[in-house]
Amino acid sequence: MDETVNIQMSKEGQYEINSSSIIKEEEFVDEQYSGENVTKAITTERKVEDDAAKETESSPQERREVKRKLKQRHIGMIALGGTIGTGLIIGIGPPLAHAGPVGALISYLFMGTVIYSVTQSLGEMVTFIPVTSSFSVFAQRFLSPALGATNGYMYWLSWCFTFALELSVLGKVIQYWTEAVPLAAWIVIFWCLLTSMNMFPVKYYGEFEFCIASIKVIALLGFIIFSFCVVCGAGQSDGPIGFRYWRNPGAWGPGIISSDKNEGRFLGWVSSLINAAFTYQGTELVGITAGEAANPRKALPRAIKKVVVRILVFYILSLFFIGLLVPYNDPKLDSDGIFVSSSPFMISIENSGTKVLPDIFNAVVLITILSAGNSNVYIGSRVLYSLSKNSLAPRFLSNVTRGGVPYFSVLSTSVFGFLAFLEVSAGSGKAFNWLLNITGVAGFFAWLLISFSHIRFMQAIRKRGISRDDLPYKAQMMPFLAYYASFFIALIVLIQGFTAFAPTFQPIDFVAAYISIFLFLAIWLSFQVWFKCRLLWKLQDIDIDSDRRQIEELVWIEPECKTRWQRVWDVLS
């Protein structure tokens, strides 16, 4: 009897087992055996299948595949947690100080429409081809290999540098309570903690982020309820606050740079618009998790559809109440003291006179930044893993543990955390600020290339004769929103360093503001020469099949929400 088993590897690293021996065994049973001999033949068949399975599990390709262990509730909360971060808690201070409560509110609403457009573009592509670090892969497939590699490396570097920022900030948050332990010690402690956490299988990361995001959601909803009560007069000896601070000092901020009132206010609003764009970064993180999502074509659209709710509730509503509780001329907004003291959330709580809440809120900030640091390593490692899988980085970076963790990519990402010591060293502040600028603008490039990729994606499927109505998720108002987002993101990238030109030109500030653009161009030109490729793929050469057909063959069975609490969390996530 022939007991050989042929194993064919697909593009996804999945395996198809052609067991010709099994067919021959069954035929042999029918013709020659009965009774005990049937049992013997079936045992032989199972042994062949088991040997094939073992060979499949131990294959080299299997050691390069992450696991689809993130459930729908994990995806929802990771997307939500990416929205509620340090950018929201700390980053809304400068817009409030420069543009005032109304100006800041308008800038966040406007940027909300831009990020909504980006997530719509991402949602349509990532549900069609759900792969790890999807938008760097999409840029490679729909635009060009050079742009895909550049986008991937810029995005990876941005999260590496952000990880260094979070490590330095964690120590500053603890200094709100005590300065007994030096900042450098906290950097080492949290680096070890966050790096080791990312060595566990992704399902544990999903559970951790689910719990942390739940705490952040409850805390933010609690703050909104608390703010509403204070605005209505709870605990206030001089009556309801209402719109008091919109009348005095006013609804519009003092502006910046120009002595002319209207011109200064406009520049202040432009500045707040750029700050809002930085603050919204992280809403695209659902695209990173696509390659590890179970049932991605159900989980990912659901997370994408709720972006509007998250923007309106957690950004706009929070900013609205903060604008009622904190005047734009509050000196704490420009505080150079303890990091968390300049948070408008903390200022509004302290101004209310509640003694216990500042400590509680500081604990929430600590948990939030810890979650952000954990996500920084996760995101960076998956981007680097994806680059390796697509032959854009050394092959060993895509090796994974039995649990599907790309451990070399995790270590290569987390090692950048030691740049946090630049914040501790005297005279290194300028260099650290340059790194932070690379972080912010690299996120803008990712948004820009998501929109460009979606435009090319729509053109490619139309050329193939595929209707967008047949896609797992159809983005709204396309292609208008893709062009809309592309235009304003490109504009923000160009004007985000405008303060370097006024009132006089500052060369150092100019380099700090635009170093990321120079870096992007340098990396792109290097890869363009390396690949010797076209600036853009021809439409007929765009690959929309790789990684897609394997997903279409898989079937996931989602457990139903049986208890009341499960249904509540299902709605929230």
Curated annotation (Swiss-Prot):
Domain of life, per lineage: Eukaryota
UniProt key word Membrane: yes
Membrane topology summary: Multi-pass membrane protein
Keyword Acetylation appears in the UniProt entry: no
TM region positions: 74-93, 96-116, 154-174, 180-200, 210-230, 266-286, 307-327, 360-380, 404-424, 432-452, 478-498, 511-531
Intervals, Cytoplasmic compartment: 1-73, 117-153, 201-209, 287-306, 381-403, 453-477, 532-573
Biased composition range(s): Basic and acidic residues: 43-65
Residues on Extracellular side: 94-95, 175-179, 231-265, 328-359, 425-431, 499-510
Gene3D superfamilies membership: Amino acid/polyamine transporter I (1.20.1740.10)
Region (Disordered) residue spans: 40-66
Cell compartment(s), UniProt: Membrane
A GO cellular component annotation in the UniProt record: membrane
Subcellular location, principal: membrane
PANTHER family assigned: AMINO ACID PERMEASE (PTHR43341), ARGININE PERMEASE CAN1-RELATED (PTHR43341:SF4)
Protein name listed in UniProt: Basic amino-acid permease
Organism: Saccharomyces cerevisiae (strain ATCC 204508 / S288c) (Baker's yeast)
Record gene name: ALP1
